Amino acid sequence: MGKYFGTDGVRGVANQELTPELAFKIGRFGGYVLTKDTDRPKVIIGRDTRISGHMLEGALVAGLLSTGAEVMRLGVISTPGVAYLTKALDAQAGVMISASHNPVQDNGIKFFGSDGFKLTDEQEAEIEALLDKEVDELPRPTGTNLGQVSDYFEGGQKYLQYIKQTVEEDFSGLHIALDCAHGATSSLAPYLFADLEADISTMGTSPNGMNINDGVGSTHPEVLAELVKEKGADIGLAFDGDGDRLIAVDEKGNIVDGDQIMFICAKYMKETGQLKHNTVVSTVMSNLGFYKALEANDITSDKTAVGDRYVMEEMKRGGYNLGGEQSGHIILLDYITTGDGMLSALQLVNIMKMTKKPLSELAGEMTKFPQLLVNVRVTDKKLALENEKIKEIIRVVEEEMNGDGRILVRPSGTEPLIRVMAEAPTQEVCDAYVHRIVEVVKAEVGAE
């Protein structure tokens, strides 16, 4: 991670850390780095439903236009929609304005290259070097060489038509409950599943600029679980604010997380000859039960650091086509170049149709180890990892576990948090281990 770019672009509190002035510079310098070898380059921009999206979009557009780029605004659209359209529309770059699952006061800016993939570390470093320069020495075109802006609000429908053709049958006869987090999928997901002839019930589909992710979406699936039980739905699908995550709910109201969704997809893809190199790429946060279920089905796993960008890098390196995170980022590289909540949802429902099995049965083939994750707000993430007392309590707990479970302590890539996670044979033991470490982290580097 750099000074400005975290694991998922540039993020911060809108109008304080992520200011219009910074957004202008990011547009100008980012646009230059990604389009400098192209005459009259095209850059597309999408955003989620946050109140700050318009402000940041205006500044970004101005920065891009100042380099001579032609800018196409997509309006409210999901992050994977921007990734797909960047390549489909032959744009030199795509930009998404979103802070994903974060609260409304945050916002972020992430770029996609002409191939639809997120930027490399080298590209981000080049942009950061320009941001840190005291003097802006980039060319300043004038007159007819300046860029122009246009709107392409049909982009969302073009993207939906693309992902819709990845399933084999319609979804008639199924009742699907949707939670769109008052975010980027609020209009898109209900249209998509209704178009596939499913009966739908919805929540989180009334964005007002301030309610994105507020007690709804993939970080609050328990709310959708109540709707599933109330309506007698066959499945619930919860997306996050920018639509790159999926958490599901089975017909009994049980939450089905990213690990379980990956396992279901991996098993089906292996059975149908689609799983490349018989391998799934996941992160160190995936549940031990996920790996045991893969082993039982003779499927290989490959672990990376936390962050969908690292999963993607490993997938590209090894030629794999399925990967993801427990948090619900599922990457289906045969179809798209980033995590995609709606595409993952289509595949999950399609597997239910093809196997004629309810989601509870599909998910039940994986037994999860009890797990607890606690986020501790800290004054300094780097100091926390170097603190001797914190390192000592982690060592003591790992010795007590004696291989029967695991501890993972790591910094958040996007927020001032230390994440403390444990897995153990029982929830009671798991909770005790986590809280012992959390107490030390709070005492040593905890923020008020």
Curated annotation (Swiss-Prot):
> What positions are modified (Phosphoserine)?
100
Q: Where is the active site?
A: 100 (phosphoserine intermediate)
Gene Ontology terms describing biological process: carbohydrate metabolic process; peptidoglycan biosynthetic process; UDP-N-acetylglucosamine biosynthetic process
Top-level enzyme category = isomerase
- Reaction(s) catalysed by this chain's protein: alpha-D-glucosamine 1-phosphate = D-glucosamine 6-phosphate
- Co-factor binding comment: Binds 1 Mg(2+) ion per subunit.
**How does it get modified post-translation?**
Activated by phosphorylation.
User: What's the superkingdom here?
Assistant: Bacteria
Q: Which cofactor does it need?
A: Mg(2+)
GO MF, any single term: magnesium ion binding
* Alphabetized InterPro entries for the sequence: A-D-PHexomutase_a/b/a-I, A-D-PHexomutase_a/b/a-I/II/III, A-D-PHexomutase_a/b/a-II, A-D-PHexomutase_a/b/a-III, A-D-PHexomutase_C, A-D-PHexomutase_C_sf, A-D-PHexomutase_CS, Alpha-D-phosphohexomutase_SF
- One Pfam match: PGM_PMM_IV
**Residues involved in Mg(2+) binding:** 100, 240, 242, 244
Which EC number(s) does the record attach to this protein? 5.4.2.10
Q: Which UniProt keywords apply?
A: Isomerase, Magnesium, Metal-binding, Phosphoprotein
Q: Name one GO cellular component term.
A: cytosol
| NCBIfam families attached to this UniProt entry | glmM, PRK10887.1
Instruction: Quote the function comment for this protein.
Output: Catalyzes the conversion of glucosamine-6-phosphate to glucosamine-1-phosphate.
Q: Which family does it belong to?
A: Belongs to the phosphohexose mutase family.
Instruction: State the name under which the record lists this protein.
Output: Phosphoglucosamine mutase
Q: Which organism is it from?
A: Bacillus thuringiensis (strain Al Hakam)
Q: Which gene encodes it?
A: glmM
